């Protein structure tokens, strides 16, 4: 009842009344009233009601206004943290200098208000959302706080008055329970509602949660109240279940309980009733494994999984069955117990249930600055952790959900203090590991590695969604995050049961994604599961490993390492048992995933390197080592197999795996530990055993025979060579790589850097990316740290970014210094680090180029040999590999085979063999003290060599070798020959003794048997015969005739060579000289000289080292070199061999020929490109100006680039010039000032477009059209400043009929990108330049020469009359029409048809609005104006391209593009269709040749435009175009002279307007005084005076803007300044006339200084006598009047005076025009990109008010536009395209704010131009991915501007695509 009465009162007074009641000491009635009111207002059954929110706001404010209340609360804000929360795509900052946690981030405001000068920071776009850490000393250093959070704000904030938040404490609990009840009510389990529309529920709650968010933003005081309510258990208890009588609340609570149940969770009470499984469970009792505990939802039943088709392309039987595990999970309660004790806990529960709605997440995070809340919330989060991950696994939106989860967890776990706290109190580590295990257990399958039938190991199935979609990453990322804290990692390493659990987790990945080699047909479905496998190993196994390793750096942590190593070995042993592994890997199986091996390897390495542990104490017994070595070795051999195309039937993905394995992000977690582990095994196992294992794994044992032929059971012959090369390269890497064997971190970084730079020049960012970094961000050597930069400057030179003429933009690159090539280039490291084999070649090519350039070596060099860092003492055993007999036998055999030219040997094989010998010489075994060979004969039947030292074995001679060969082999043939000749071996006793002693088994095959025997002795399985080692041979061998394979027979070969003698013979062979090494050579040799060179150098270096290190070797060498007899090749090679050799040689020669041809072709093409592509190199001298080709009177001949014929252009078969027509507004964007306009970057700055050339001319024309006759206006100005048509050519010509067939063929060719043939577009057939029309060349001579050029002696008046006659020649027309279309009289020829078609093209080039300026569009007047303006546009643009003047003279790039001569004739031919009626012919009014007809003005509705208002260059073009062509030069000069007088008079008028009244008076008097002097018509003083006196008659022309002029003329006008101004005023006209004369008559343009330009131009145009001294040139001296100058000026002024109805200021502005414009410029941009970005990326769109997704800026006018924005679309055209049409006549240059790149729109196409903002390393940062500070690159911006002005975008940028109006 009471509530009802309260509800009726107004809210304000109710709230005030209640607050007063509650403040009393006895507040019970107030409380009761409030509760009743709230029961009624916040009734959850009423749904979400805006009224309820309104009530809450009034109640909280307690009678004040809510906004007022907010302000008051905010004034008590004591928060010292920023805590601003943002969502995905927000722009934030990260400073590595200030960050303690790598996840630290700052909002833009805090970043900009802090001082981060010189720090290593970057801007980034948030992926998952985040929060600002400013003020949080746990996450970042205080020095980085902004000035707002640097002060400990809390200290000086007054304490909060009790009653301020009194109402909040009462009202908010009820408000929050309402939200919770609403969430309970709205939730339905997925089963019940098919579409389960949780979004709807959330939408209705939106205002409520937004209100909570608003409260959090009131600051610390309000957050404290909220925290109290959210965490108060008592309030929760009272409100959660509801009072007895509240049926709704009861029902509601039951819904909550059922939701808990359905989630597979049990509340603790129920659990207790079931017999307290709780915390009492011991580790062992956990028994059934995480899976079985998960109630109904979790058990992944078999039926479920077997329904899913088997998609991962593995050959399972039918479907793969998932496997259930019983691992001893730590604590079953982790996965299924939840008990909520406060609002916060239940709120989080619903947040999870509703899959993390953004608003809820933001609210929960906004509360974090409150410390109490932070701790409670973190505990709550951990308590719900298992539940979160279970929900994530079931979610359909797992991506979004993952991001939201990490958004929260990263805020909590980055804080070490907090992470440690929850690890200790809430078992965070146990929870995480258990949940990880539980997650992976849902997708386990039986492993098929090794023993497919009896394999007991289970692995994850990489085809499962969980792995494919990376669903596990939030969990793993949290795990890595907490392991980065030392205190947490230590707990983990100390907890042995946890470690064991972790090892079992890692073993799930051991052997995953197994590949089986396809032997028959190509695999049908190429599985892409390998992406998931590599990602999983890196993220779930390697990164936690790196995290743990960072905490095992010092001696004190030895025990951790020992423990991990022990558990690794135990788990590995279990794994070997589970997969049934004995001693041999199964054939044709390959997995790249051995995380257990890698954990073991990395902890070993760390223990030895950093903790001083003894390696042997960490190693298992020999048997285990032999097992451990097998799988990593298998991977190395398989890499070779993949590169030898043996896995080609498995598809491309297998190559993808091989590449990923060595790729920079993976290599130090994969191939590096593998190689290190093999190095450890090699250093501890018997070297003979190890070497023979390698050759057996690589399947090349059969090849290692001295026989010339052999059978290989496992390899095709074309696979033998790459596999042998692979095996040897692997051995070299194994023996020479020192990454884990003694190099310091700095040395490693340097070696990595050098190897990457040697492959290619690199940008800074790609180098950062390619250097394998320790994936844990807290590790020491991080790319980007100081050591990285120092190292980089030590090894590389910076090449600044350049713009290549071809238009491709280079970034700033780093290139190796010369001394790096000389001393540090390490081909072995390069081979290890190359993803693509071609990179090795690239490094070698660059090396060879360096040697040539520095003159060290000119031929093709071999990879240089590099001295190695000394081995760490623990790994000394590795050297024994190089000193074992097995390797020496292999080396001997291969040297022999190469010398004998056996098949499948190669330069690379020799190179690697020599490398191994040299490594052996450089790394002697320590205990081998005896220098000469020991006498002990080893008890070993493969005793080729007496001892193991390489040095002594080098000179050991081997006389005879026993080989097993097929009967057909040449060796058998030779033996038969010998027998036929009764040739027996010599039989003296001593000889036969050595014969017996030196008979060797050549096949290393016996070694394999030996290896097997040793292996089996160790494993105590001696009952197996060793004989099983001899493999059954395959029945078919490739190079034998079909049928039964020939029997193998044993033969004895006579060899009598030592390794030394073979090396000498190979030297002779390579140098093709018989005695290439003389005796004297040995004496003077110096190994240091032989660092760089080819095979000869390498052999010489080895021989020098051998003789330097052993006297015996030196003696043997002298003997060998002393026998300077020609080498006798051992017996003949069989004809079959010969044939194959010849074939190979022929092939080689053919290949070389082909290479040579290709190179020649390429160089020809290149030289052509250099001459032809004039656009690319503006300064080239090869002028292609067709007009200047012929200066003789003969006809011009043109070459057709299509048919190749040369001939004149004729009426019937015209030739045309390839041209590109494009509309252009470049001229219209010119301004008066030379300084470009600045791009606005604050709200105060603006750009005003009114002062541009285009705008000024528009205003001028519309002004004239208001007062004068339209047809006259249209001949008084030019248009085309905006949207004018510019014509340019590449200079190539073709027959027009050839062109048509060319276009036809293009039409049928669908592949052309970005070219629209329907629009007439094509590329020039010769130079491939873009074009869209053909301009016909008129037949006849190229230039008007001879008689046409003769200097004229006629008087001025005669010439004036002749010109008038020429104009009349075309016939007289009726008086009324001033311009009239004339009927074509001629029958059209092909030429005229083409000319008309080009005119049509020209008209179609620009938009209608740029053509119609007349009152009646489409009229002849309009057409006439458009046509002559095309000529004007092209002349003006050529002037702009020449730098705005003609001082540079000669041929410029612009001249080469210009086709004005041809264009002029086409326009003239078109204009011939019009004639100017003599009555209105301006010529008569210019020369007063007929008396003026003033009387006729009266019947005209409007006067004509006075001469003084007309644009003089326009008149020039009109006259020249309408007179018959070719025009004599004397007539041209006459027209120029007459027009110069007018231009000069206009200059005087314009000048006089700028004078003050006194100055006018003074000059008028001076002029009058001089008027009667002789030659007064050539003195500007008298003319100026006359002008002023005439114009003063007009009503107030001079008196309009007296204030402005007085301001203008504050400077005093001296005669010099007046002369200068007059010249400047006339210059634009003179330049244009001169340029036109140059194109019509071929006159040259001599260059000159700027100050001499006026005199030079007047001389060129024949205005001034050439004798005049250039210094004192007077502009008036060039005048030539055909009648009295004063009469003419009076006449012209009278036209202005007669204008009664034109307002005077208009007349003044038309008179005071200034024809000068500065060069066109793009906007001036700020130096720092951040200035643009900060202002524009948040700026809102003018049409919809929202922030655009892709904002862009027009760099021409500064307009802010939406790229692709639908808000600004008009008629299906997006804003950028629209703007490009409006602003640039279809050319637009836009800077994309969020990407820092520039796009160009040209017509219907667009292209990405690149960026003009580069970082400190000269690199672009497209899409701002790296977020480093960017600075304006002036050179690039200049190039962009040049391309815009020169209209060369189409030619220079190659990658164009259609935009379909969508930009």
From Swiss-Prot:
Pathway terms, separated by semicolons: Protein modification; protein ubiquitination
Zinc finger (UBR-type): 80-151
Residue ranges, annotated region (Disordered): 302-330, 970-995, 1128-1152
Disruption phenotype: Heterozygotes fail to form cohesive and stratified epithelium in their optic vesicles. Average somite angle is increased by 30% and the posterior central nervous system displays a gain of Rohon-Beard sensory neurons. Defects are the result of decreased Hh/shh-signaling demonstrated by the reduced expression of the Hh/shh target gene ptch2.
Gene Ontology process terms (BP): eye morphogenesis; protein ubiquitination; ubiquitin-dependent protein catabolic process via the N-end rule pathway
RING-type zinc finger locations on the chain: 1270-1328
Keyword Transferase: yes
Top-rank taxon, per record: Eukaryota
Comp. bias intervals (Basic and acidic residues): 971-984, 1134-1152
Enzyme Commission identifier(s): 2.3.2.27
Keywords tagged on the record: Metal-binding, Transferase, Ubl conjugation pathway, Zinc, Zinc-finger
Alphabetical list of Pfam families matching this protein: PRT6_C, UBR1-like_wing, zf-UBR
GO cellular component, one term: ubiquitin ligase complex
GO molecular function, one term: zinc ion binding
Catalytically driven reaction(s): S-ubiquitinyl-[E2 ubiquitin-conjugating enzyme]-L-cysteine + [acceptor protein]-L-lysine = [E2 ubiquitin-conjugating enzyme]-L-cysteine + N(6)-ubiquitinyl-[acceptor protein]-L-lysine
Family membership noted in the UniProt record: Belongs to the E3 ubiquitin-protein ligase UBR1-like family.
Function text: E3 ubiquitin-protein ligase which is a component of the N-end rule pathway. Recognizes and binds to proteins bearing specific N-terminal residues, leading to their ubiquitination and subsequent degradation. Positively regulates hedgehog/shh-signaling pathways that function in eye development, neuronal specification and somite development. Activation of shh up-regulates transcription of ubr3, which in turn promotes hedgehog/shh signaling possibly by controlling negative regulators such as Kif7.
UniProt protein name: E3 ubiquitin-protein ligase ubr3
């Amino acid at each position: 009842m009471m509530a009802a009465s309260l509800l009726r009162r107004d809210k304000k007074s109710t709230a005030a009344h209640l607050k007063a009641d509650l403040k009393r000491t006895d507040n019970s009635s107030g409380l009761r009233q409030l509760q009743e009111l709230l029961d009624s207002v916040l009734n959850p059954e009423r749904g979400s009601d805006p009224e309820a929110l309104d009530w809450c706001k009034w109640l909280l404010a307690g009678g004040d206004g809510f906004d007022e209340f907010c302000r008051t609360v905010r004034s008590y804000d004591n928060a010292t943290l920023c805590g601003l929360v943002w969502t995905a795509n927000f722009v934030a900052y990260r400073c590595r200098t200030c960050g303690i946690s790598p996840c630290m981030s700052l909002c833009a405001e805090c970043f900009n208000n802090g001082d981060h000068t010189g720090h290593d920071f970057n801007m980034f776009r948030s992926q998952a959302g985040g929060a600002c850490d400013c003020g949080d000393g746990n996450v970042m250093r205080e020095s980085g706080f902004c000035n707002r959070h640097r002060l400990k704000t809390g200290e000086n904030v007054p304490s909060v008055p009790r009653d301020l938040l009194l109402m909040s404490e009462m009202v908010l609990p009820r408000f929050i329970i309402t939200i919770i009840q609403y969430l309970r009510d709205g939730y339905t389990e997925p089963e019940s509602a098919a579409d389960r529309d949780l979004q709807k529920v959330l939408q209705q709650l939106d205002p409520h949660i937004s209100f909570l968010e608003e409260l959090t933003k009131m600051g610390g005081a309000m957050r404290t109240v909220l925290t109290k309510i959210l965490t108060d258990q008592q309030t929760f208890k009272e409100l959660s279940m509801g009072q007895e009588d509240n049926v709704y609340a009861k029902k509601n609570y039951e819904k909550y309980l059922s939701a808990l149940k359905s989630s597979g969770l049990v509340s603790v009470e129920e659990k207790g009733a079931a017999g307290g499984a709780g915390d009492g469970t011991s580790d062992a009792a956990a028994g059934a494994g995480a899976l079985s505990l998960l109630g109904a939802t979790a058990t992944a039943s078999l039926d479920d999984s077997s329904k899913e088709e088997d998609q991962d392309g593995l050959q399972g039987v039918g479907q793969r069955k998932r496997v259930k595990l019983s691992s001893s999970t730590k604590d079953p309660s982790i996965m299924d117990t939840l008990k909520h004790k406060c609002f916060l806990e239940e709120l989080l529960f619903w947040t999870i249930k509703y899959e993390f709605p953004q608003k809820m997440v933001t609210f929960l995070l906004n509360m974090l600055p409150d410390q109490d809340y932070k701790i409670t919330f973190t505990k709550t989060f951990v308590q719900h952790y298992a539940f979160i991950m279970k929900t994530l696994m079931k979610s359909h939106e797992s991506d979004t959900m993952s991001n939201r989860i990490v958004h929260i967890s990263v805020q909590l776990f980055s804080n070490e203090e907090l992470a440690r706290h929850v690890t200790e109190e809430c078992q965070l580590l146990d929870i995480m590991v258990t949940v990880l295990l539980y997650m992976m257990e849902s997708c386990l399958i039986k492993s098929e590695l090794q023993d497919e039938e009896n394999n007991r190991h289970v692995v994850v199935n990489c085809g499962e969604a969980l792995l494919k979609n990376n669903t596990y990453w939030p969990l793993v990322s949290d795990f890595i995050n907490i392991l980065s804290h030392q205190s947490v990692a230590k707990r983990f390493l100390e907890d042995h049961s946890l470690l064991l659990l972790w090892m079992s987790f890692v073993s799930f990945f051991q052997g995953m994604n197994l590949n089986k080699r396809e032997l028959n047909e190509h695999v049908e479905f190429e599985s892409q599961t390998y992406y998931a496998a590599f990602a999983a190993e890196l993220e779930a196994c390697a990164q936690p490993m790196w995290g743990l390793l960072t905490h095992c750096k010092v001696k004190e942590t030895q025990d951790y390492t020992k423990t991990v190593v022990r558990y690794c070995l135990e788990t590995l042993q279990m794994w070997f048992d589970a997969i049934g592994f004995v001693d041999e890997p199964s054939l044709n199986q390959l997995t790249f995933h051995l995380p257990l091996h890698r954990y073991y390897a990395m902890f070993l390495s760390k223990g030895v390197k950093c903790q001083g542990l003894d390696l042997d104490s960490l190693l298992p017994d020999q048997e285990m080592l032999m097992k451990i070595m097998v799988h990593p070795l298998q991977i190395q051999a398989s890499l070779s197999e993949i590169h030898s195309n043996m896995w080609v039937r498995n598809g491309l993905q297998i190559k993808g795996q091989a590449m990923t394995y060595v790729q920079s992000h993976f290599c130090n977690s994969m191939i590096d530990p593998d190689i290190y582990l093999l190095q450890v095994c090699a250093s501890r196992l018997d070297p003979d055993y190890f070497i023979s294992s390698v050759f057996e794994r690589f399947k090349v044992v059969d090849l290692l025979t001295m026989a010339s032929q052999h059978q290989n059971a496992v390899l095709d012959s074309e696979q033998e060579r790459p596999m042998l090369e692979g095996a040897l390269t692997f051995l070299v890497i194994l023996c020479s790589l020192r990454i884990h064997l003694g190099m310091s971190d700095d040395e490693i970084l340097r070696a990595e850097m050098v190897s990457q730079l040697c492959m290619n020049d690199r940008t800074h960012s790609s180098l950062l990316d390619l250097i394998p970094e320790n994936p844990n961000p807290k590790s020491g050597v991080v790319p980007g740290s100081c050591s990285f930069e120092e190292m980089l400057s030590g090894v590389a030179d910076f090449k600044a970014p350049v713009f290549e003429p071809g238009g491709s933009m280079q970034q700033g690159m780093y290139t190796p210094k010369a001394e790096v090539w000389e001393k540090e280039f390490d081909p072995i490291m390069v081979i290890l680090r190359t993803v693509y084999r071609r990179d090795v070649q690239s490094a070698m090519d660059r090396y060879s180029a360096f040697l040539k350039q520095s003159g060290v070596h000119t031929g093709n060099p071999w990879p240089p040999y590099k001295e190695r860092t000394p081995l760490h003492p623990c790994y000394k055993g590795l050297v024994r590999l190089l000193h074992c007999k097995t390797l020496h036998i292999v080396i001997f055999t291969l040297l022999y085979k190469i010398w004998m030219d056996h098949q499948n040997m190669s330069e690379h094989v020799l190179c690697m063999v020599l490398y191994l010998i040299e490594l052996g010489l450089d790394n002697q075994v320590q205990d081998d003290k005896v220098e000469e060979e020991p006498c002990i004969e080893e008890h070993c039947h493969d005793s080729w060599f007496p001892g193991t030292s390489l040095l002594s074995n080098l000179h050991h001679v081997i006389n005879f070798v026993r080989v097993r060969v097929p009967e057909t082999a040449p060796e058998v043939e030779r033996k038969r020959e010998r027998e036929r000749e009764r040739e027996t071996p010599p039989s003296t006793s001593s000889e036969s003794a050595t014969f017996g002693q030196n008979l060797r088994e050549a096949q290393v095959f016996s070694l394999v048997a030996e290896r097997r025997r040793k292996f089996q002795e160790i494993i105590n399985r001696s009952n197996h015969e060793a004989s099983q080692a001899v493999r059954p041979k395959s029945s078919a061998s490739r190079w034998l005739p079909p049928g039964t394979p020939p029997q193998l027979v044993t033969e004895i070969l006579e060899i009598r060579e030592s390794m030394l003698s073979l090396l000498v013979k190979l030297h002779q062979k390579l140098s093709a000289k018989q005695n290439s090494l003389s005796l004297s050579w040995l004496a003077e040799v110096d190994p240091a000289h032989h660092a760089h060179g080819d095979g000869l150098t390498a052999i010489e270096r080895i021989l020098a080292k051998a003789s330097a290190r052993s006297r015996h070797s030196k003696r043997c060498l002298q003997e060998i070199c002393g026998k300077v007899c020609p080498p006798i090749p051992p017996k003949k090679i069989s004809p079959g061999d010969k044939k194959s050799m010849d074939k190979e040689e022929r092939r080689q020669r053919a290949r070389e020929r082909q290479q040579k041809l290709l190179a020649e072709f390429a160089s020809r093409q290149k030289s052509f490109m250099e001459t032809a592509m004039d656009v690319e190199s503006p300064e080239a001298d090869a002028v292609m100006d067709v007009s200047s080709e012929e200066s003789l009177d003969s006809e011009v001949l043109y070459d057709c680039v299509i048919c190749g014929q040369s001939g004149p252009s004729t009426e019937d078969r015209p030739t045309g010039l390839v041209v590109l027509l494009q509309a252009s507004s470049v001229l219209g964007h010119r301004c008066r000032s030379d300084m470009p306009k600045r791009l606005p970057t604050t709200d105060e700055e603006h750009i005003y477009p009114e002062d541009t050339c285009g705008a000024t001319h528009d205003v001028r024309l519309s002004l004239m059209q208001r007062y004068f006759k339209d047809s006259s206006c249209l001949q008084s100005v030019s248009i085309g400043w905006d949207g004018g048509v510019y014509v340019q050519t590449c200079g190539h010509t073709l027959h027009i009929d050839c062109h048509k067939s060319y276009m036809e063929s293009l039409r049928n060719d669908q592949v052309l990108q970005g070219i629209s043939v329907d629009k007439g577009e094509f590329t020039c057939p010769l130079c491939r330049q873009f074009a869209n029309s053909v301009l016909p060349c008129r037949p006849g001579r190229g230039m008007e020469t001879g008689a046409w050029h003769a200097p004229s002696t006629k008087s001025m008046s005669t010439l004036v009359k002749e010109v008038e006659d020429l104009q009349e020649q075309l016939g007289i027309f009726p008086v009324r029409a001033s311009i009239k279309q004339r009927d074509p009289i001629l029958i059209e020829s092909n030429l005229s048809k083409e000319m008309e078609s080009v005119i049509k093209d020209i008209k179609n080039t620009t938009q209608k609005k740029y053509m119609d300026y007349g009152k009646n569009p489409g009229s002849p007047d309009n057409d006439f104006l458009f046509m002559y303006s095309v000529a004007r546009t092209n002349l003006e643009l050529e002037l702009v391209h020449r730098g705005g003047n003609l001082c540079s003279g000669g041929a410029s790039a612009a001249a080469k593009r210009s086709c004005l001569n041809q264009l002029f004739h086409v326009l003239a031919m078109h204009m011939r269709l019009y004639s100017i009626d003599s009555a209105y012919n301006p010529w008569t009014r210019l020369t007063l040749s007929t008396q003026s007809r003033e009387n006729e003005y009266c019947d005209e509705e409007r006067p004509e435009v006075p001469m003084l208002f007309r644009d003089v260059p326009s008149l020039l073009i009109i006259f020249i175009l309408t007179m018959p062509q070719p025009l004599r030069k004397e007539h041209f000069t006459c027209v120029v002279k007459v027009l110069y007088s007018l231009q000069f008079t206009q200059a005087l008028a314009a000048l006089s307007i700028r004078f003050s009244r006194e100055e006018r008076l003074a000059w008028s008097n001076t002029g009058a005084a001089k008027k009667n002097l002789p030659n007064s018509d050539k003195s500007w003083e008298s003319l100026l005076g006359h002008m002023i006196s005439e114009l003063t008659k007009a009503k107030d022309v001079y008196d309009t803007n007296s204030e402005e002029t007085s301001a203008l003329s504050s400077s005093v006008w001296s005669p010099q300044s007046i002369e200068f101004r007059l010249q400047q005023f006339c210059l634009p006209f003179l330049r244009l006339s001169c340029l036109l004369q140059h194109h019509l008559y071929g006159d040259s343009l001599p260059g000159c200084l700027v100050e001499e330009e006026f005199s030079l131009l007047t001389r060129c145009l024949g205005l001034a006598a050439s004798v005049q001294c250039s210094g004192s040139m007077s502009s008036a001296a060039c005048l030539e009047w055909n009648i009295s100058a004063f009469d003419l000026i009076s006449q012209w002024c009278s036209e202005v005076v007669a204008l009664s109805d034109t307002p005077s200021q208009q007349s003044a502005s038309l008179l005071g025009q200034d024809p000068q414009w500065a060069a066109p410029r793009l906007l001036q941009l700020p130096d720092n990109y951040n200035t643009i970005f900060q202002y524009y990326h948040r700026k809102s769109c003018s049409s919809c008010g929202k922030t655009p997704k892709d904002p862009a800026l027009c760099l021409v006018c500064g307009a802010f536009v939406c790229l692709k924005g639908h808000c600004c679309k008009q008629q299906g055209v997006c804003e950028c395209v629209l703007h490009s049409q409006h602003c640039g006549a279809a050319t637009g240059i836009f800077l994309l704010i969020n990407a820092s790149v520039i796009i160009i729109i040209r017509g219907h196409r667009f292209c990405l131009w690149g960026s003009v903002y580069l970082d400190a390393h000269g690199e672009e940062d497209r899409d701002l991915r790296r977020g480093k500070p960017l600075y304006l690159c002036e050179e690039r911006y200049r190039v962009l501007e040049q391309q815009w002005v020169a209209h060369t975008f189409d030619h220079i940028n190659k990658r164009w695509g259609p935009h379909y109006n969508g930009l």
